[in-house]
Amino acid sequence: MLELHGCLTISETYKDEDKYTNESLENIMRQVTRIIESSGTQLTLRYMNGTTFLTAQLYANHRTKETDNIIETYKSVSKTATGSYGIIYLRDDEDTRHYNEFQIFIFKKGECIHKTDDIFSPCIPTIEDDIYGL
């Protein structure tokens, strides 16, 4: 089973926005929109209280290309709009290396950091019992 939760607050830059023209900031947001539209994924782009954010929820029996597309889309948006920040939480019990843990993808200042979660992981016994005696 695969479980993915993602949220990315989109901001054009982490630097002083006053040093950018409105046109250049709007161009960044147009690029972000194109990235999302061409991703081939079921991402949700929303605006709330003057803030743009991107969310992803995926539950699947097996990992598919959509999982990788979501992660790559978040990376592309983060590199384009460098003020963006957010997180993807991923659990894939068929991943030979990370089968018993959540993986975290942290996005900030145009970078993506991949870590292993230590709150819910190891999934067995932290959030589930070992019902098969593995």
Predicted features, each with a name:
Residues 1-29:
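Short, extreme N-terminal segment that most often corresponds to the first beta-strand
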Residues 7, 57, 89:
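Residues in well-ordered beta-strands of folded domains
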Residues 13-15, 63, 95, 112:
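Generic "edge-of-domain/loop-turn" microfeature
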Residues 25, 73-85, 122-134:
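Ampiphathic alpha-helical segments that act as solvent-exposed interaction surfaces
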Residues 30-75, 79-81:
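Short, intrinsically disordered low-complexity segments
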Residues 38, 85-90, 118-122:
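Short C-terminal domain-edge/linker segments immediately following a structured domain
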Residues 61-107:
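Amphipathic protein-protein interaction modules
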Residues 96-134:
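Acidic, proline/glycine-rich low-complexity IDRs
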